UniProtKB/Swiss-Prot annotation:
It is found in: Cell membrane. Binds 2 [4Fe-4S] clusters per subunit. Coiled coil: none annotated. NDH-1 shuttles electrons from NADH, via FMN and iron-sulfur (Fe-S) centers, to quinones in the respiratory chain. The immediate electron acceptor for the enzyme in this species is believed to be ubiquinone. Couples the redox reaction to proton translocation (for every two electrons transferred, four hydrogen ions are translocated across the cytoplasmic membrane), and thus conserves the redox energy in a proton gradient. This subunit may bind ubiquinone. Its main location: membrane. This is NADH-quinone oxidoreductase subunits H/I. [4Fe-4S] cluster 2 binds at residues 475, 510, 513, 516. It comes from Nocardia farcinica (strain IFM 10152). The gene is nuoH/I. HAMAP family: NDH1_NuoH (MF_01350), NDH1_NuoI (MF_01351). In the N-terminal section; belongs to the complex I subunit 1 family. In the C-terminal section; belongs to the complex I 23 kDa subunit family. The keyword Disulfide bond does not apply. It catalyses: a quinone + NADH + 5 H(+)(in) = a quinol + NAD(+) + 4 H(+)(out).
Amino acid sequence: MPDLSLFGHDPFWLVVAKSVFLFVYIILIPLVAVLAERKVVARMQMRVGPNRVGPFGSLQSIADGVKMAFKEDLVPAIVDKPIYLLAPVVSVIPAFMAFAVIPLGGEVSVAGNTTALQLTDMPVGVLYILAITSIGVYGIVLAGWASGSTYPLLGGLRSTAQVISYEIAMALCFAAVFLHAGTMATSGIVGAQHPTWFVFLLLPSFLIYCVSMVGETNRAPFDLPEAEGELVGGFHTEYSSLKFAMFMLAEYVNMGTVSALATTLFLGGWSAPWPFNLIPGADAGWWGLLWFTAKVWTFMFVFVWLRGTLPRLRYDQFMRLGWQLLIPVSLLWVMLVATARLLRADGHAWATGAQVVVGVALTAAMIGLFLRAGRRPAAPPEPEPEPSGEAVFLGFPTPPVPADAHRVDNPKGGLLEPLAGFAVTAATMFKKPNTEFYPEQKVPTAPRYHGRHQLNRHPDGLEKCIGCELCAWACPADAIYVEGADNTEDERYSPGERYGRVYQINYLRCIGCGLCIEACPTRALTMTNDYELTDDNRADLIYEKDRLLAPLAPGMVAPPPAMAPGTTEADYYLGAVTGGAPAAEQPAPAGAKGGAR
């Protein structure tokens, strides 16, 4: 078990190697967390998530980082530029520094040197983490103030109040831990959790810490400093490109930091969980790093689960939770832990068991307060019945209000509804996604699906369109343009006197309503099942006549053909011409002209 005497004796090259290893370990947290969050939330919503960049979308985070780096870096004219540029740095550096005293594993051997999988440790390691993580809020406050805009300033002020409120509760959780462990060194706290983890001995502290760490990292449902619906983007509204990326990096690294700290303080750090701890050497050497990482990512999953399940709290609810519940309970619990420690020092072995029992009771009391605070208010009194069958409002009769309109059936407690939400999202993760893997797998459309338009032909190849422009007049989006022209004996395109010389449909405007189909008197215009209309430029989304005409079927004659011998215009409209080309003409192969590009 590493202790403080093990630190300070590593060769310089080993200290550098451990620093590089820790930096890479931290950098991997946001890269993996962003992808995992998008994948997990997608599964909760019965989607697939990122699946384009790399195998199964595994390189999506790298692609997003490159894209972010090449975005235009805008600096508004009204900002306080030095502080504006400094704020992202102040936010991200403390997130990395906090990991310096967190033990990732036990003692390992590297090139013949025995060292701890921890960069360093100190007698006040927990206080160091608390102080360093508190510095990060200055970056948020400075970003809001230096942006010179109202929304970022409000986001910065919210963040200040949020961190102050929940930092107190978190510090009291730390106090309970090092009172029980008898040390503030992180390696010593991990050693004090053999064989019983503090999550069982200090259950109220663990519960309060889990709530506080979500508020400390500004994550949903406590993401009030960057509430999109109220503050646009909060404190980083005016940031873009790499400066915005630094704030995102700080957020995800902070998630990893508080998760690693929860693992260290309450879940035994790098020690193996039951029943693996029964295996000799299960947490020796590099195995400890595996257990530590697994516990950290369990907390990271809970962060994502919270985001995918719970809505954002109101600001007054959030502050009331911190000041009226978490802080008073934390103060009471710290006094109880201190009393139990004093009793143990006097030789009363039963104090530990009593502490566990009181902790469970206090946790149940907290849950009860949650239920009471979240219970729906009682239904208002039933309204007095109207004197007549109708009420009159502004001279207009309105129906009477039913007597049970305000009745609430089966009101649920404050925690039961969120728990039901967690059950729903957990069950949805294992359902088959509804995402269609287009274009690799194209699902056939319904038979009556209306997609791209088509100009139809008569059985001998003549066009049905007569250039009447009724379709253009019927289009509510003004997406169709038609120019008619006269047929001649030498150049005939339709059986009648007129044909559509120019026919255009602008698919940037078309809404697919089908009114043009209903307006066509000759059934010349129909809609096909083709839904692939996307293009990379505007010009190609304006379909001309040659792209709208139906392809020539076998037996049809390439335009301009003559009318079938012995037929009149009426024969075409009555359906007397059923197929075959005129004897004087040579049939064209199918698809010779017209159809989709």
